[in-house]
């Protein structure tokens, strides 16, 4: 089983993550071990840069999977999710660029665009140009402001190529952080849910932001929330809290 160890931080000491994934079952996965029905029934195939950076074998398998799912009509979603403990920015860029022509939805932070891909200018122009170069349908970029280890602001911006339109909303401010691990994945899950269920980038952004904000308040790296709570948080964010307790 692949695991990781997380050491909580406190300013000025940053949190630390140590990966232990060598010789895990995932590392030995082969393409022919996946039933053919999985490829034809999948609507969105999502993968991240962490997977590409684990090993050469998994890197190659991931590329095969992307091609296979793409050929079967799935939307390909990719989160850069750069981790310097796995590889350098240059190594990551070289490998990620290889798969971008097959990607439909890209998740990347503004820092990633500027540091890894060496892009300059306004983030909106960067996202628009990136979508044009690689024929990306949608690009999402999150923004996190760290007030302290226990107080964050979170927002995002989405660019939809077919409409040449950007979507954003007011940030979730002063989130009381219990555990930030997994909040990026929660954001991605919210956005992809919005795309799958609503086929609406603006609604997808709201689901993503709310999911990420909620995950910061939950211990562990899994977002244990339901759609009712998610919609309540979105409504309160847009119209203000109605009460201090839900009961």
Say what each PLM segment does.
Residues 1-49, 231-247:
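Conserved N-terminal subdomain of the carbohydrate kinase-like
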Residues 22, 50, 81-85, 111, ...:
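Active-site beta-loop-alpha junctions enriched in small/polar residues
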Residues 51-60, 88, 116-119:
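Glycine/threonine-rich flexible loop motifs
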Residues 61-73, 95-102:
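Catalytic-core regions built around general acid/base machinery
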Residues 68-75, 133-137:
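A short helix->loop->beta-strand "cap" motif at the edges of active sites that frequently abuts
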Residues 76-78, 106:
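Hydrophobic faces of well-ordered beta-strands that scaffold small-molecule active sites
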Residues 86-163:
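Conserved phosphate/ATP/ADP-binding segment of small-molecule kinases
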Residues 167, 171-247:
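Conserved post-catalytic alpha-helical subdomain immediately downstream of the catalytic base
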